UniProtKB/Swiss-Prot annotation:
This is Coat protein. It is found in: Virion. Keywords: Capsid protein, Virion. GO terms for molecular function: structural molecule activity. It comes from Satellite tobacco mosaic virus (STMV). This virus depends on tobacco mosaic virus for its replication.
């Protein structure tokens, strides 16, 4: 695996065989000392190359997941890696602040619990200009101009 990429560690927890925890668990904020379970949701999207490596404002990376039988979710950690083209066997690391959507409301959501129904989504906007270096900004994922893929890992605690 490339430097900076987190390797998922599959772990059996009874009936939740698809539960994934991250090896770097120590880097997560302790928002809930006794979580029901934590799931890391990998999500990859290809960056469409447009004119001068631009994508429309409002383009969204999103991860939708089922949350049946849970009343709240806490986003514990959000991380992203951008894979450069040509490949250099390395991912550039970015920490993002997510937008958490429940119903019609959208709010900044990290390290706090929120009541949810049966579906939740975490989204990320990317700006128009992709020529700059990879930086982290509020609710925005900026990628380098030679980036072709973005991988997101969202670690959530469901209660």
């Amino acid at each position: 695996m490339g430097r900076g990429k987190v390797k998922p560690n599959r772990k059996s927890t009874g009936d939740n065989s698809n539960v994934v925890t991250m090896i770097r668990a120590g880097s997560y904020p302790k928002v809930n000392p006794t979580p029901t379970w934590v799931r890391a949701i990998p999500f990859e999207v290809s960056v469409q190359s447009g004119i001068a490596f631009k994508v429309p404002v409002g383009s969204l990376f999103s991860a939708n997941f089922r949350t049946d039988s849970f009343t709240s979710v806490t986003v514990m950690s959000v991380r992203a890696w951008t894979q450069l083209t040509p490949p250099v066997n390395e991912y550039s690391f970015v920490r993002l602040k997510p937008l958490f959507k429940t119903g019609d409301s959208t709010e900044e959501f990290e390290g706090r619990a929120s009541n949810i129904n049966t579906r939740a989504s975490v989204g990320y906007r990317i700006p128009t200009n992709l020529r700059q270096n990879t930086v982290a900004a509020d609710n925005v994922c900026e990628v380098r101009s030679n980036c072709r893929q973005v991988a997101l890992v969202i670690s959530c605690c469901f209660n």
